[in-house]
């Protein structure tokens, strides 16, 4: 019901009175700007009230927890090298005869290197914008520098987890990629000569990875992760890092178990209810709960999504058999048999293409099956793809226009021809290693011996030459995350929402 629905009500005393009432009500809603070039009886004299402070709808810098709290080191070249102590020596016989010289054994080291990458965004403020009086006396140029700095650091914090130089060469290797390669190398001695399937098998079967199987985070998972870090890989723990929804679901599990004692002071009247967990106590010490809303971000898309950039690649082309189930002894669909939908997009450093539907109807997958997907590179286009992103729905009964597809993994374009994760040539296999719509968590000790952000160039502003009535500038950051001891970090994967309310 709005004011115009009262036009024919007799209570207003006829159409003339109604028109006068409406005129008065409308006048109160108009501003001086709306009276421009009109003869009026004073409404144009109104002066608008403008709040002097900008209400920031986006995130703030203090929400970038992983980037802010990761130890920083200034490096002096784009390539940084370091040594890992692999083994104190061989396990030799230590007992000797009286006066006998003990057996000799050498310490073993591994020489490693990592390359700094170059990140930045450009901003511009016109000369009129810098001359105009703005809310709160704000300097528009200063404000725009702050905005672009926050934007760049937010994007870096987001990419700290999922960046992969094998998919986009200009990216650094993020935490998940370094963790995968480091854990596989620690467990197997080296990843040299290993296929993608062998590396994935080694990683997801490692003691440094725990699969929650779409369940919520529990004390048992945290305890197991702490045990793996301390007793398997000789590490320490002081924190667990994940997305807010993971800890939100974690505390919900305890809400229904709260007991209210009637009659006890502050139990009912004036009580504080709910659950807030700042630390989780394990057998091996206390771990602080660290929440980062940009940690392990996997945003869903719909089949109708469009390209994210004019420089994004074209849409992939469907193969002979877009999707088909295959029997597989390595599948992780054992507990997740059901029907699913698939999409694929092509991606480069500029953006992502519109998706190609690989399933026209929901595809039924049994507990002993995996899914093979087939597609080829886009035809034509000025910007070629460097990788492909595979999307899958959660378990569904039918696919509709509103169905959401979640990114589950990304493959380099160079790996498509040979087949991915055990699939035949030109095909990609989904073994449900990552469950759609889930998150990860990391448990580790945040120390410069474990991880650092190596800064070849700290975040700074570079002004461009003035060639027009505007000021242009770039906010730059040169650096890369580095996991020195990746196996001393335990990753809990596939944290979902099953188990809530149980």
Residue ranges and their predicted role:
Residues 301-439:
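Disordered, low-complexity "stalk" and linker segments at domain junctions of extracellular
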Residues 1-311, 339, 366-371, 421, ...:
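Flexible, glycine/threonine- and acidic-rich loop/arm segments that mediate assembly and lattice contacts
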């Amino acid at each position: 019901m709005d004011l115009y629905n009262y036009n024919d009500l007799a209570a207003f005393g006829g159409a003339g009175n109604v028109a006068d009432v409406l005129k008065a009500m409308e006048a109160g809603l108009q501003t001086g700007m709306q009276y421009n070039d009109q003869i009026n009886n004073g409404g144009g004299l109104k002066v608008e009230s403008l709040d002097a402070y900008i209400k920031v709808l986006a995130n703030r810098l203090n929400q970038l927890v992983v980037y802010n709290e990761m130890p920083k080191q200034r490096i002096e070249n784009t390539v940084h090298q370091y040594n890992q102590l692999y083994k104190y020596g061989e396990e030799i016989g230590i007992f000797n005869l009286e006066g006998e010289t003990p057996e000799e054994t050498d310490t073993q080291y591994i020489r490693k290197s990592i390359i700094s990458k170059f990140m930045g965004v450009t901003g511009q403020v016109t000369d009129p914008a810098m001359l105009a009086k703005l809310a709160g006396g704000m300097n528009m140029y200063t404000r725009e520098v702050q905005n672009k700095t926050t934007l760049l650091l937010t994007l870096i914090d987001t990419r700290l987890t999922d960046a992969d130089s094998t998919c986009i060469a200009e990216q650094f290797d993020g935490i998940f990629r370094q963790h995968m390669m480091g854990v596989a190398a620690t467990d197997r001695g080296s990843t040299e000569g290993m296929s993608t399937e062998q590396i994935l098998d080694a990683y997801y079967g490692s003691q440094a990875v725990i699969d929650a199987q779409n369940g919520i985070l529990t004390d048992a998972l945290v305890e197991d992760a702490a045990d793996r870090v301390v007793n398997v890989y000789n590490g320490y723990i002081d924190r667990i890092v994940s997305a807010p929804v993971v800890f939100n679901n974690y505390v919900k599990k305890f809400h229904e178990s709260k007991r209210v004692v009637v009659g006890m002071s502050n139990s009912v009247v004036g009580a504080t209810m709910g659950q807030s967990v700042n630390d989780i106590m394990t057998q091996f010490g206390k771990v602080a709960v660290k929440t980062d809303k940009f940690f392990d971000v996997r945003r869903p898309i719909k089949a109708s999504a469009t390209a994210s950039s004019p420089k994004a690649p074209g849409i992939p082309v469907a193969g002979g058999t877009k999707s088909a189930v295959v029997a597989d002894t390595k599948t992780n669909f054992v507990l997740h048999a059901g029907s699913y939908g698939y999409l694929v997009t092509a991606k480069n450093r500029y953006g992502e293409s519109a998706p190609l539907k690989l399933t026209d109807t929901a595809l039924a997958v049994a507990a002993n099956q995996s899914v093979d997907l087939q597609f080829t590179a886009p035809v034509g286009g000025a910007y070629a793809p460097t990788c492909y992103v595979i999307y899958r729905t959660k378990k569904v009964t039918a696919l509709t226009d509103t169905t959401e597809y979640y990114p589950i993994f990304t493959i380099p374009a160079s790996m498509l021809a040979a087949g991915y994760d055990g699939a035949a040539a030109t095909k990609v296999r989904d073994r449900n290693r990552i469950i759609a719509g889930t998150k990860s968590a990391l448990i580790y000790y945040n120390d410069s011996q474990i991880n650092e952000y190596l800064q070849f160039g700290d975040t700074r502003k570079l002004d461009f030459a003035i060639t027009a009535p505007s000021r242009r500038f770039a906010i730059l950051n040169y650096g890369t995350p580095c996991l020195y001891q990746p196996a001393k970090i335990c990753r809990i994967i596939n944290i979902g929402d099953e188990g809530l309310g149980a």
